[in-house]
Amino acid sequence: LLRQLGIELSEPMLFGLGEGLGFIFWNMKSMNFPFIGGRIKTDYLTQNIAKNLNLELTVKETVSTQKAWNNIKQLIDSGQIVGLKLDCFYLEYFSKPIHFAGHYVAIYGYDHHDAFLVDTIQQGGKVKTSLQSLALARAEKGPMSSKNLYYTLSKTDKNFDLKTAITQAIKNNATDYLNPPITNMSYQGILKTSTEIMKWFHVSKDIENDFRTSAMMME
């Protein structure tokens, strides 16, 4: 999405500009196993990038699967690359699929069967998945999910200074990390996890799989 605007930045740089460093220990009754994350909520990452680079972020949602596809199809046909939020479990190029509805990709094209996406370097960069699987991924309900969320980025009349943006992002990230709103986030969340993790051996129904999945998510 940024390259379309003439902005060339690496994944690590975008993570920093998105004020992405964080920690969360998340457990709900509806979850089979607690979730451990090493970054901020994915929604905020995109918002922070747009804020620090003086870009306009347009986010939309709809409960209609057909409308959700028609909307992004129209944008793609007009030459606009679109960001999508979805559950990566359904993406056919994932070698080890797990349910995580806070995953983001960019879609830049499609044909009668497949959608052409850009994912992280870890997941292969330029990839494809069937239109059917994409629809399932976008409409999935559950923790961290949204209603077929999609977004676009556009330039404003304000240019950005990268050095200033980096400095501000680091300050903001440090401030948020040192002042978590609840005790299961940031450094307080790490402390809480250190005590809660010992209980997992007694509550997990599949210790090997649950611990392996947790480690993979952190990586």
Where are these regions (language model features)?
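Noncatalytic regulatory segments and standalone regulatory/sensor domains
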Residues: 113-219
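Conserved active-site-adjacent core of cysteine acyl-enzyme catalytic domains
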Residues: 2-9, 20-158
